[in-house]
Curated annotation (Swiss-Prot):
InterPro entries: Ribosomal_bL28, Ribosomal_bL28/bL31-like_sf, Ribosomal_bL28_bact-type, Ribosomal_bL28_sf
The species this protein was found in: Synechococcus sp. (strain RCC307)
Membrane spanning stretches: none
GO cellular component: ribonucleoprotein complex; ribosome
Domain of life according to the entry: Bacteria
Gene behind this protein: rpmB
Protein name: Large ribosomal subunit protein bL28
Entry keyword Cytoplasm: no
Region (Disordered): 1-21
GO MF annotation list: structural constituent of ribosome
HAMAP family, per database record: Ribosomal_bL28
Family: Belongs to the bacterial ribosomal protein bL28 family.
Gene Ontology biological process terms in this record: translation
Alphabetic keyword roster: Ribonucleoprotein, Ribosomal protein
Length: 78
């Protein structure tokens, strides 16, 4: 399974690691993904999702159903 957030679509970022001598090497900055079982009130059931921690904060603020609707994701298919 690829390291992509199922809700926000966040994925790894290509960056550079810069040493003290300013030697640059390529570095992959991974997304902080968590496997979570979230309660979906509208569907009256649990939904298992692999989401980023920033998406979890947004879910706490807006609610799972509202956030998924905003992103155009159908939770019934998950």
């Amino acid at each position: 399974m690829s390291r992509v957030c199922q809700l926000s679509g966040k994925r790894a970022n290509n960056g550079m690691a810069v040493s003290h001598s300013h030697v640059r090497t390529k570095k992959l900055q991974q997304v902080n993904l968590q496997q979570r079982r979230l309660w979906w009130a509208e569907g009256n059931r649990w939904v298992k999702l692999r989401v980023s921690t920033s998406a979890l904060r947004t879910i706490q603020k807006k609610g799972l159903g509202a956030y998924a609707k905003e992103l155009g994701i159908n939770l019934a298919k998950i």
